[in-house]
Amino acid sequence: MQYKTFLVISLAYLLVADEAAAFWATLAKGALKLIPTIANAFSSKSKKRREINNVFEPYHENLDLELERFLSQLQ
């Protein structure tokens, strides 16, 4: 309980005090740098997956045709 009280008092001080401007500016700069980084990480994974699927599609089509040919020979 004392920990929560200390946290509330310290956050209230940072909101009111003039010295806290540098603290909040640093937090804002860090957040503004992290948000695009996280967004790019998720978007690049989906692009890579699409590229991989496009690269292997012709190979899979040839494999399917070969498997169908072998199955027709067995029947």
Curated annotation (Swiss-Prot):
Residues 51-75 form a propeptide. It is found in: Secreted; Target cell membrane. GO terms for cellular component: extracellular region; membrane; other organism cell membrane. Keywords: Antimicrobial, Cleavage on pair of basic residues, Membrane, Secreted, Signal, Target cell membrane, Target membrane. Expressed by the venom gland. Residues 1-22 form the signal peptide. Belongs to the non-disulfide-bridged peptide (NDBP) superfamily. Medium-length antimicrobial peptide (group 3) family. Amphipathic peptide with probable antimicrobial activity. May act by disrupting the integrity of the bacterial cell membrane. This is OcyC3. It comes from Opisthacanthus cayaporum (South American scorpion).
